[in-house]
């Protein structure tokens, strides 16, 4: 088997009926492998997302929580949704939506354009936040 890239740059394992998702940031790599489409994003909790928040978070998303990690969780969720959708040209603000973030339960509810709600998992570990969908 070979690992190659799809037309969108996503990893593909040629010759295998599996799906793979990969994300990396300084200090961490996250990988998910599943028999169904999957995606993952990882970011350090210390990254400052607040300056760019208005470019990817709607007013409704900014009102979901007063947790200081909300911008990071929404960013990771939208990156995960973008990868999961597998469609080029989706806009982080207008096409990808986060409807709920529950840090305690580790659940994010998101939506791609006008599609059905999707349940994503959220984990925090060692100063990193990971959001994935299997």
What are these regions (language model features)?
Residues 1-134:
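Core catalytic alpha/beta fold that binds nucleotide/phospho-ligands
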């Amino acid at each position: 088997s070979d690992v190659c890239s799809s037309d969108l740059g996503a990893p593909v394992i040629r010759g295998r009926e599996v799906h793979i998702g990969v994300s990396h940031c300084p200090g961490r790599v996250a990988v998910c492998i599943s028999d169904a489409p999957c995606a993952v994003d990882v970011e350090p909790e210390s990254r400052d997302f607040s300056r760019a928040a208005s470019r990817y978070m709607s007013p409704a998303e900014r009102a979901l929580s007063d947790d200081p990690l909300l911008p990071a969780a929404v960013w990771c969720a939208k990156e995960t949704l973008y990868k999961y959708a597998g469609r080029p040209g989706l806009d982080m603000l207008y096409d990808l939506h986060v409807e709920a973030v529950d840090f305690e339960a580790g659940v994010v509810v998101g939506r791609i354009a006008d599609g059905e709600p999707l349940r994503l998992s959220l984990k925090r570990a060692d100063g990193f936040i990971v959001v994935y969908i299997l």
